[in-house]
Structure formats: structure tokens, C-alpha cells
Swiss-Prot record:
Ranges of the Extracellular topological domain: 97-102, 178-188, 239-290, 349-369, 433-434, 494-504
Cytoplasmic membrane side: 1-76, 124-158, 210-217, 312-327, 391-411, 456-470
Protein name: Sodium-coupled neutral amino acid symporter 2
Name of the gene this protein is made from: Slc38a2
Keywords, sorted A to Z: Amino-acid transport, Cell membrane, Disulfide bond, Glycoprotein, Ion transport, Membrane, Phosphoprotein, Sodium, Sodium transport, Symport, Transmembrane, Transmembrane helix, Transport, Ubl conjugation
Length: 504
């Protein structure tokens, strides 16, 4: 048995306590958005972590060590919140603008509850299946196909997360440079071109960090990312009371440098009856962009590959205790997402872009507070991308050459290839909305709906197929298939419609 598997379980009838062997080598959680786990095994080589497990490890022989867990309840809540929150928060106002307040709250509630239910399935499957690694559960349940499905979904989700982070660099870094250098005319300036800047940041800053064999700053990155998002939320709430409605007023005020529009004229425009209609919130909206709402929400709630490592580190671990951690974390993120979406929508209404932070620059320009937010978010995402690259590279390494010794050449080639591929996506994919939509409808749906329920049905033997629990898991799996196929189909139709409209 590998160290990445649990040796034995001692589950009480109420499943409130468990004792198992743990992975002494494991020092790194699968980051879905931000890395979630502040592990105290930071000196172990991450390249030796078995992200894509092989049934035969060849030369490597492991002994099973008992590790009781040392992370407090509160820190576990913090770590799981880190794993949940990510760049998806920037797209939630766009989702609300295309669903309406009431429909968005309904969808947000259902997605958060379903995500929490899938955590319940995952924890129970881990107890019964005897493994704390997502891919290994897939291997135990369905062999190589299950392992590849889990690894592929995690890799796709991480590539989507990387792409969204680099999209933020592409959108926001030119605005920061423009504000710091006080540049008015941007025509022909290469250093204000987002495509050039994302390449520059990727290969000058991100690549050297990604080539490291250890990420000692992992825990700091996690904390910084969550703090940046909290700061972002505070600014969104404050700006709601500073930006006039309709936003055309702010646009004219922003574009007028010679005082052409007086305050009286601006007030008259704001009182226009037609403009006032745009400042009335809508509760149910159905349009061609509504289809992106569910994928954006599922993308925003993916944290499941990080749940098991956090569970492993939890002091006095039990499934019930970990579920309490999950409930608090999901409820906190539910409130954070709802507030960010609501105040962003009530600030810009139908003018919300797919990346909320960029909307502020388009409407009101840049002030000191927004500049600080942009700098904080840019630093956070730049430091997080190398963290996300690690599990992708490890999965590729263990898939292509699991028994070979470490090679700097192979390590570097895989890293550069991953980074180059992600940069191509960021340069040629039109908007961050497409990343949120595609990854949310595919990989996120797999990780939240399909895989946990499929693993549960296969590995939890003590419950018959006709039991309420198994029937519920089966219905959950089928709902995930419907969400995936339905969302992907509608998104592709929207892409085709946009392409045909652009061609005319």
C-alpha cells in the first residue's frame, strides 16, 4: 500500500471519528483556484508527489506512517475558503446581470448546496475507499479510466484557473501602467498591449518561479489571495455609493477633462426618465448570455481536489468535523459571492463586463483605491500561477514517464509547454467569459457533480443500490451530466451565433 493511501480506518457507528494512516510525503494540495493547504512538509520535493498515481511504483517502496493531523478547525476553514475563492468572483456580477437578482440567488443557492453535498460524498467515499487522493479514488473505482478522468478534470480545471489569472494580467496590467505613467494616448505603445504584457510577465516572472522544485511561499500566496479578494469586495461595496446611476453620467464625467459638462447638466441627464429605467434592478432575465451563469458559478465553487488534503491535516479529524469545516467555508463564500455580485450589478446594471474589475476602468477610469486593488490582485494572481502549474506538471510527468528519475530538461520542457499553451489560450480566446463558461461546464461539472457521485456509487459497498443514499447519488450524477451537456451545448451555440454574426 502506498503512503498516499490510508492504511486502516476506525469509524465509529456515527462516523464521528476516524483513524487512518496518512501520506507522510504529501505536502501539496491540488489548487483549483488558489492553493489551499499550508502544509508543514514544504521541504519535500513536489516533483515526487504522486498526482497521477500508478498501481505499480517500480523502485519506490513506501511504508505507511500514521499522521494524526495538526491543523486547527479555524485554520482548516481558512484553508478551504482559500481553495474555494478565486478569479470566478470577478465574473459573478456579469452572471447576475444576465439572470436577474432572484434567479441568480436561486442558482447560487443550488450550486453551493450541491457542491457541499458532493464534498459529503467525497469524504464518505474516501473513508470507504481507503484513499485521500482524488485520482487514486478514481483508480480504485474504475481503474485506469477513472484515474485518467479524475486527473484530466483536475488538469483542465487548473489550466482554466491559470488562464483566468493570466486574463486578469492581460486586462489589468496595461491599466496599471497607464495610470502610473499618466499616459493619455495609448496608440502604438507596445508596453500597453495586453498580449505582449502577459507574455512578458509569464516568461520573466512566472516561469522562473514555476521552474523551482519547491514552493516555500505556498502558504503566503494562499493567504494573500484571499485577503485580496476580501479587499476587492470591500471596494466593490464602497464604489456602489460613489458611482452615479445611470453609468452614462460617470462615463461623461470621466471623459470630460475641460469641464464641458456642468454638475447641473449631469444631474439633468441622471434624472432623464429613460436613463432612470436602466437603474431599476431586474429579478429575472433570460437572454443569450444567461447560459454562462451556471458554468461561472460551478467554476467559482470548485475546491474538491483540495478537500481531502485539508481533511488529512485536520486535528481530531472526523467526517462530521470536516463537514462542519465545509459548511462554514461554503456559507462564508456564499455570502462573499452574493455581496460581490449584488453590489457589482447594482453599480453598473446591464453595463457589467465579464470581468468586473475591468468594468470600473471602462466606466469611471482609475483612482487610487482601484489602482491599489489592481496591484494587489495582480501580485496575487502572478504568485498563484506557479502554484497551479505544479500539479499539472506532476500529472503529465507521472503519466508520460512515471518510473524515470528527475530530469531538469524534462522538468523545464513540460513547464514551458504548459505556460506557452496557456498563453496561447489567453491571447486567442476572446474573453474571460469563455474560459469561465467552458471550464465551468466541463471540468468543474465533472469535479462537483459527476466524479464524486460515480466514486461513491462504486466504492461505498455497505449501501445497496436501492438505498436512499445510492439513489440520491445516482440522481446527482445524472443532474451533473445534464448540466454538462446542456451548458456545453448552449455555450457552443452561442459561440456559433457570435461567429456567424461577426462574419456578416
Amino acid at each position: 500500500m502506498k503512503k498516499t493511501e490510508m492504511g486502516r480506518f476506525n469509524i465509529s457507528p456515527d462516523e464521528d471519528s476516524s483513524s487512518y494512516s496518512s501520506n507522510g510525503d504529501f505536502n501539496y494540495s491540488y489548487p483549483t483556484k488558489q492553493a489551499a493547504l499550508k502544509s508543514h512538509y514544504v521541504d519535500v520535493d513536489p516533483e515526487n508527489q504522486n498526482f497521477l498515481l500508478e498501481s505499480n511504483l517500480g523502485k519506490k517502496k513506501y511504508e505507511t506512517d500514521f499522521h494524526p493531523g495538526t491543523t486547527s478547525f479555524g485554520m482548516s476553514v481558512f484553508n478551504l475558503s482559500n481553495a474555494i475563492v478565486g478569479s470566478g468572483i470577478l465574473g459573478l456580477s456579469y452572471a447576475m446581470a444576465n439572470t436577474g437578482i432572484a434567479l441568480f440567488i436561486i442558482l447560487l443557492t443550488f450550486v453551493s448546496i450541491f457542491s457541499l453535498y458532493s464534498v459529503h460524498l467525497l469524504l464518505k467515499t474516501a473513508n470507504e475507499g481507503g484513499s485521500l487522493l482524488y485520482e487514486q479514488l478514481g483508480h480504485k473505482a474504475y481503474g485506469l479510466a477513472g484515474k485518467l478522468a479524475a486527473s484530466g478534470s483536475i488538469t483542465m480545471q487548473n489550466i482554466g484557473a491559470m488562464s483566468s489569472y493570466l486574463f486578469i494580467v492581460k486586462y489589468e496590467l496595461p491599466l496599471v501602467i497607464k495610470a502610473l505613467m499618466n499616459i493619455e494616448d495609448t496608440n502604438g505603445l507596445w508596453y500597453l498591449n495586453g498580449d505582449y504584457l502577459v507574455l512578458l510577465v509569464s516568461f520573466v516572472l512566472i516561469l522562473p518561479l514555476s521552474l523551482l522544485r519547491n514552493l516555500g511561499y505556498l502558504g503566503y500566496t494562499s493567504g494573500l489571495s484571499l485577503l485580496c479578494m476580501i479587499f476587492f469586495l470591500i471596494v466593490v461595496i464602497c464604489k456602489k455609493f460613489q458611482i452615479p446611476c445611470p453609468v452614462e453620467v460617470a462615463l461623461m464625467a470621466n471623459e470630460t477633462v475641460n469641464g464641458t459638462f456642468t454638475q447641473v447638466a449631469l444631474a439633468a441627464l441622471a434624472s432623464n426618465s429613460t436613463a432612470a429605467d436602466t437603474c431599476r434592478p431586474r429579478y429575472f432575465i433570460f437572454n443569450s448570455q444567461t447560459v454562462y451563469a451556471v458554468p461561472i458559478l460551478t467554476f467559482s465553487f470548485v475546491c474538491h481536489p483540495a478537500v481531502l488534503p485539508i481533511y488529512e491535516e485536520l486535528k481530531s479529524r472526523s467526517r462530521r468535523r470536516m463537514m462542519n469545516v465545509s459548511k462554514i467555508s461554503f456559507f462564508a463564500m456564499f455570502l462573499m459571492y452574493l455581496l460581490a455580485a449584488l453590489f457589482g450589478y447594482l453599480t453598473f446594471y446591464e453595463h457589467v463586463e465579464s470581468e468586473l474589475l475591468h468594468t470600473y476602468s471602462a466606466i469611471v477610469g482609475t483612482d487610487i483605491l482601484l489602482l491599489v486593488v489592481r496591484l494587489a490582485v495582480l501580485v496575487a494572481v502572478t504568485l498563484t500561477v506557479p502554484v497551479v502549474i505544479f500539479p499539472i506538471r506532476s500529472s503529465v510527468t507521472h503519466l508520460l514517464c512515471p518510473t524515470k528519475e528527475f530530469s531538469w530538461f524534462r522538468h523545464s520542457v513540460i513547464t514551458v509547454t504548459i505556460l506557452a499553451f496557456t498563453n496561447l489560450l489567453v491571447i486567442f480566446v476572446p474573453t474571460i467569459r469563455d474560459i469561465f463558461g467552458f471550464i465551468g461546464a466541463s471540468a468543474a461539472a465533472m469535479l462537483i457533480f459527476i466524479l464524486p457521485s460515480a466514486f461513491y456509487i462504486k466504492l461505498v459497498k455497505k449501501e445497496p443500490m436501492r438505498s436512499v443514499q445510492k439513489i440520491g447519488a445516482l440522481c446527482f450524477l445524472l443532474s451533473g451530466v445534464v448540466v454538462m451537456i446542456g451548458s456545453m451545448g448552449l455555450i457552443v451555440l452561442d459561440w456559433v451565433h457570435d461567429a456567424s454574426a461577426g462574419g456578416h
